[in-house]
């Protein structure tokens, strides 16, 4: 509770008697306008904004003269709300079916403080639930309210010095909301475990529909002066589930709820909240006296516009309390997984089923934010909000010995992180509600949204998600400097760093197979997406900030592989915008060579810091190159970046990058200088490396390439192949040979260009095998081989045509053999590459799989399925039996030489995980194998969506 000084208490009493005393509201006000339906008209909206006089007519004279649309306003005082509530309660009291006689209590008309007399020898469990009498109506107080710790705190914290003569020493006033209405026969009940002493026990979730009962709590938060975006620990508390069934009932009148009921006292300060890792209550000492009347949180409509708005939101025309949330009123139910599943047919990738388009897709972004907000409160018990997630993560024990370390997050960092993320989350909710077409367009509608509350998991869980982020992403992207992630050092109270940390948590949560982790991940992705655009719009210099662009990189990666149609579309669309920011910031251009100063401690430190800034930007550029390559590969689009623009230096060695001290870095630099490298801190750019690759200067093996450099070399090769493939699709199926005597631009010419690209891929394969033989267990290099085989598949197949065939589109009645040739140009090479994709991904550790691994399985599966289905259709139309394997069988997922042959009479087969083979002459078995492979791998929303698509494909072709 809150300590109120004598001066403030006198001022509060004077304010209450002037504006909220029911007796004062009975007398007519001189000069007031005529009352309309119990409402007192005041100045219209236009006049009030212009601060001019208004005759309070409809329309008023000023609006008529100026041709404005006049919007009438009415006074909404607490006394009028109480009068309407009392009138409605009196009408309902006539139909009361039962009346119980228990200890009488006193009900004040303005503030219904329930006074319960307690004998010294009487315990809380022996107190009879009071009955409120008002005009013949009766309502029982739920006994569960007297058992809750909040009630115990009110009884234990009474100060005997503040009692006056009107209240005995053992009489306690409960400022509880009492709805003067008979109980409904269908009144809901809930059993809530409120034993806060045993914090480690699993809570029993109430059986009440969460959002139906939580909407009034959000509305209370929006009108609480102590609650705001910057205050992460609200003084309000979700009482909808703690007050028992009689107070969680939607018919309960909370219009007169006292603010003191929503305060926590010092008796709860020793509890170890999930939101307070230090074990100290974040609510502090909030004790106050009960001898003075508390100001209603709904009052003072003339001092806060939110009071008018809250009344508009919480009460219907009859004055009854309405617990339906704004989202439900506006037709915006909380999004569930079914909404995300409905949008899977509109994905920009994996389009093997009949597509739908954006206009027919449900909106999921607002639902993700609301689900995160709902989960944060755990149906009214915030200390247990992420209890299930903590229990699930406690059983996981990952070995991160070979990865960057994560410094434990202290309580101060977590508190600040949650405070700023609360503001981000509220901003995101406001934007989505403002853009809702079904939203209330009245002047009061813009402020009627319930205030959100975002409660992050404990520091231990956040640390686990940081480790999950390191494990799932930093193996493929060089994002972590100095060999560790220190969230306490990263946090600088600037928005870009907070957004980056939240996206790290979202990435780590997305890699965990847990429903709670997915809720947290999807909510944070949408929150950070809007916040990132906000900070760049407000400060254009942030478009060149490495931290903001690194956060944009994480969002593009998370959104593209999220499995949510809207996030995938936005990530693909904003990829070009953020890449343009990189260009305009000058990060793609070459920088002057860095000459390290190794003499003196200060010189070494300055050189290290300067190099670290330049190296961070260079690694950010080439991380964007890898993301650009992945998104273009799996979405069948051109890469955004051009190799001729990539003049920034390639990343330096990992030994330099992971040096945690100046001494380690200086020793590593000295080691490279002693080996004859004159510029160890300024490697060549990707442009220069690719030029040497084209000139075959890298074939002799004198230049040792790292796994990351080989990965980057695939980007320009893939871009060249995309250009040739687009040109190839413009030709018809009819073969037109080149005319002798001059070079013509024909399909044969383009096919020769494709063969040139295949020769470059073969040259890259030789370099990669040399690197892989030196380190066979390198996860990065094995992932590079998967990308290589997928790019090679694009050189011998037409994947968009294969998906069109799966959707049974574009069939012009031509022969099936010609369509097979239109989908797969080189069957032998295609079958080999698909088998290698299966083999490599199956042998990778589950926790080291790349995020897009299920999409790679999908592409290989679709090519093998199309090959089998097209051959079956061709044989069926020709009335021929399938050929027998006369020349043996080909294990397509076994290691093979790059140059191989596969006869059409040979039936390829795949070896399952148990060692048993199955042949690929039946396209249904190909789909079954892929579905089982996805089930055995790391779980993700993307993988589950692809599995559903493959099942639907099998049903369509059954």
From Swiss-Prot:
Any one annotated GO CC term: nucleus
Q: Which GO terms describe its molecular function?
A: DNA binding; DNA-binding transcription factor activity, RNA polymerase II-specific; zinc ion binding
The UniProt regions of compositional bias labelled Low complexity, in chain numbering, are 287-301
Where's it mainly located?
A: nucleus
**Regions recorded as binding DNA:** 44-70
SUPFAM superfamilies per the record? Zn2/Cys6 DNA-binding domain
* Gene3D superfamilies xref list: Zn(2)-C6 fungal-type DNA-binding domain (4.10.240.10)
Name of this chain's protein: Transcription factor PfmaH
Question: What organism, scientifically named, is this protein from?
Answer: Pestalotiopsis fici (strain W106-1 / CGMCC3.15140)
For this protein's source organism, the top of the classification is: Eukaryota, Fungi, Dikarya, Ascomycota, Pezizomycotina
Q: Which gene encodes it?
A: PfmaH
